[in-house]
């Protein structure tokens, strides 16, 4: 039953700073297919998955996919979370919208989207409905292709 509820849930709106300090509001992308990728610079599996995210972006962005990465950098163990985040974005060549409130696991996005582990992906359709969560690279590829009629 829970999976059915989640599949028909609307994606909560949020506003967060991007990597350049500009405010970004999620609802500005209404009407687009969106892939949210939640990660952090200190998360080894996240960093290992970043090349797959780059591949998805390169394959689907010009065909209608918007990608947003949200970093959970800002844990108490980090002495310079913003620098860690910026360096990882640069090193991993993440060229799409990058957001973080630099609050680590206390980030408001965590509760809004019920995120318990990272990396974590959330696929949101053009109507703002969450249609997939924590999907594998293969599953994302397939689902995005289907939605964009490719």
Task: Please name every model-derived segment.
Residues 25-47, 53:
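Short active-site neighborhood of thiol/selenol oxidoreductases, capturing the structured segment around
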Residues 30-32, 62, 94, 115:
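Active-site acidic short loop of glycosyltransferases
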Residues 17, 83-122, 126:
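Short, internal strand/loop/helix patches
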Residues 20-22, 34-37, 74, 106:
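N-terminal targeting or signal-anchor segments and their processing/structural boundaries
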Residues 118, 123-150:
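Thiol-/selenol-based redox modules, centered on thioredoxin-like
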Residues 48-92, 103-110:
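Structural microenvironment flanking redox-active thiols in thiol-disulfide oxidoreductases
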Residues 1-22, 27-32, 58, 83-90:
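N-proximal helix/coil linker or "cap" segments that precede and/or mark the start of modular domains
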């Amino acid at each position: 039953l829970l999976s059915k509820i989640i599949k028909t849930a609307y994606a909560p709106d949020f506003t967060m700073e991007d990597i350049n300090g500009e405010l970004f509001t999620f609802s500005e992308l209404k009407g687009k297919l969106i892939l949210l990728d939640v990660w952090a610079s200190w998360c080894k599996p996240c960093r290992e998955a970043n090349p797959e995210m780059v591949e998805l972006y390169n394959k689907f962005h010009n065909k209608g996919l918007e990608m947003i990465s949200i970093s959970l950098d800002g844990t108490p163990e980090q002495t310079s979370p913003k620098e860690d985040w910026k360096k990882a974005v640069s090193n991993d060549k993440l060229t799409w919208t990058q957001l973080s409130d630099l609050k680590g696991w206390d980030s408001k996005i965590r509760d809004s989207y019920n995120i318990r582990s990272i990396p974590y992906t959330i696929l949101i359709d053009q109507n703002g409905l969450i249609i997939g969560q924590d999907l594998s690279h293969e599953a994302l590829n397939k689902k995005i292709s289907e939605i964009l009629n490719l």
